[in-house]
Design a protein with these regions (language model features):
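Bacterial N-terminal signal peptides
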Residues: 2-14
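Early extracytoplasmic/lumenal segment of secretory-pathway proteins
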Residues: 19-84
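A structural signal for short loop-to-beta-strand junctions that line the ligand-binding cleft
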Residues: 69-73, 91-136
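Periplasmic solute-binding protein
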Residues: 81-89, 116-147, 176-185, 265-271
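Short beta-strand->loop
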Residues: 91-102, 152, 248-264, 273-276
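Ligand-binding pocket segment of bilobal, Venus flytrap-like solute-binding proteins
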Residues: 166-181, 185-255
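Conserved C-terminal helix/tail region of periplasmic/extracytoplasmic solute-binding proteins
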Residues: 221, 329-360
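Mature extracytoplasmic/periplasmic domains
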Residues: 268, 273-333
Length: 360
C-alpha cells in the first residue's frame, strides 16, 4: 500500500516538474547585474538560463536560422534590431504585460524608431555613445597641442602621425567607423552617395599607416594596460578600462571623450524572438529588468546608462554625474544615430573596409 501511495505521489508531482517556469536569456558578456537575476528568480519563481555571445553577428545568425531556444535577446538598434524586424525574426511586445514600459524615456525611445518603427519589438535596455578612450598624459607627451576633445586625434593625419608611437586603435566595425568618418567630413552619417564614400575612403587611407589595431572588446584591456593611448570604442568600455587601470595602480590615467564634432548614439534593446519557447516568462523578465531599482543596479554594475529616468535616484552619484556615461544636454545636441543600411550599401562599405584594413 505504501508503494502504491508513493507511486501516486510521484505521478501527481510529475506535472509540476514538467511545468517548471524558465526563461532563456541571450546577452552580451558581463552585461547584467547578477543580483537582478537572483531577485527575479526569487520573486517570480522563474528560473533563468543565461547564455552570452561576443558579437552581433553570432546573435543575428542564430535568430535568423530559427529555433534558437532563446526567449529574451539583446540586439543593438543598428544594424541588428532593424534587420531582425525586417525579416520578421522578432515577436511584437505585449506592452499590457510590461507595466514598467511606462517608465522609459520617450525621447530616447523615439530615437530607436528608425530601427523599430513604433517601438513594437524592442525596449531600450542600456545605451551609450561611440567616442574616444584617451590617455591624456601619453598624448600630450607626443603632441602637446593635440585637441583632446576632437576626432582629429584619429582622423587628422598630421596629428595621428605624431601620436602613433603610443598606439591608436579603432573599432573593427565598418558601419560605425564609416558613419563617424562621414560625420567628421560634414556629410550625413547614412550617406550612400558614391562621392561621399570616396571621400571617406581617401580619409581612411590617409590615416591607415598610423592605426595599430582593429578591435572591439579588446580595447578595454589595451587601454587599461597602457598599450594604446587613443581608442575609438564604446563609452562603457572606456569606463571599465579606467576602473581596471585604477585597480592595477600602474599610473595609467584614462578618460572617455564624446568628441565635439559629434558622436554616435547606440541602443541595446530587450526583444523576444518570434519562436521563443517561453514568451510569457520573457515578458515577465523584461518587465522586471525595467523596474527603476533593478535597472539602476545594472547600470551601477556595468557602467552603462539606462533609459528609465526614475532609476536616477538609485544610481551611484559618481556614475550618474560622469559625463562619459550620462552626457550633459550640451553634448547630446551633437549626437547622432545611424539608420538602416541597404544590402547594396553594406556590400560597398564592406569592400571599402577590406581595402582600408589591407592598406591598399
Amino acid at each position: 500500500m505504501r508503494l502504491l501511495w508513493l507511486l501516486l505521489g510521484l505521478l501527481l508531482a510529475a506535472p509540476a516538474w514538467a511545468q517548471e517556469r524558465v526563461v532563456n536569456v541571450y546577452n552580451w558578456t558581463d552585461y547584467i547585474d547578477p543580483y537582478a537575476i537572483d531577485q527575479f528568480q526569487k520573486q517570480t519563481g522563474i528560473r533563468v538560463r543565461y547564455d552570452v555571445y561576443d558579437s552581433l553577428e553570432t546573435l543575428e545568425a542564430k535568430l535568423l536560422a530559427g529555433n534558437s531556444g532563446y526567449d529574451v535577446v539583446v540586439p543593438t538598434s543598428e544594424p541588428t534590431l532593424s534587420r531582425l524586424v525586417k525579416t520578421g525574426a522578432l515577436a511584437p511586445l505585449d506592452r499590457a504585460k510590461i507595466p514598467s514600459w511606462s517608465g522609459l524615456d520617450p525621447a530616447l525611445m523615439q530615437r530607436v524608431q528608425s530601427s523599430d518603427p513604433g517601438n513594437v519589438h524592442g525596449a531600450i535596455y542600456l545605451w551609450g555613445t561611440v567616442g574616444l578612450g584617451i590617455n591624456p598624459d601619453r598624448i600630450r607627451a607626443l603632441a602637446p597641442d593635440a585637441p583632446l576633445d576632437s576626432w582629429d586625434l584619429i582622423f587628422k593625419p598630421e596629428i595621428a602621425r605624431r601620436i602613433k608611437p603610443c598606439g591608436i586603435t579603432i573599432m573593427d566595425s565598418p558601419n560605425d567607423v564609416i558613419a563617424q568618418a562621414l560625420k567628421y567630413l560634414g556629410r550625413s552619417p547614412d550617406s550612400t552617395e558614391a562621392a561621399d564614400l570616396k571621400d571617406v575612403e581617401t580619409l581612411l587611407m590617409s590615416i591607415r599607416p598610423y592605426i595599430r589595431n582593429f578591435q572591439n572588446g579588446g580595447a578595454v584591456n589595451a587601454l587599461a594596460a597602457g598599450d594604446t593611448c587613443v581608442a575609438m570604442t564604446y563609452s562603457g568600455d572606456v569606463i571599465q578600462a579606467a576602473a581596471r587601470a585604477q585597480e592595477a595602480a600602474r599610473g595609467v590615467q584614462l578618460r572617455y571623450v564624446a568628441p565635439k564634432e559629434g558622436a554616435q548614439l547606440w541602443f541595446d534593446t530587450l526583444a523576444i524572438p518570434k519562436d521563443a519557447p517561453h514568451p510569457e516568462e520573457a515578458l515577465a523578465f523584461i518587465n522586471f529588468v525595467l523596474q527603476p531599482q533593478i535597472i539602476a543596479g545594472i547600470t551601477n554594475q556595468v557602467r552603462y546608462a539606462n533609459a528609465v529616468p526614475a532609476s536616477d535616484a538609485f544610481i551611484k552619484p559618481d556614475i550618474l554625474h560622469d559625463p562619459g556615461i550620462y552626457p550633459p544636454d550640451s553634448l547630446r545636441q551633437a549626437f547622432f544615430t545611424i539608420g538602416p543600411v541597404s544590402s547594396a550599401a553594406t556590400r560597398a562599405r564592406t569592400r571599402m573596409w577590406s581595402r582600408f584594413k589591407a592598406g591598399n
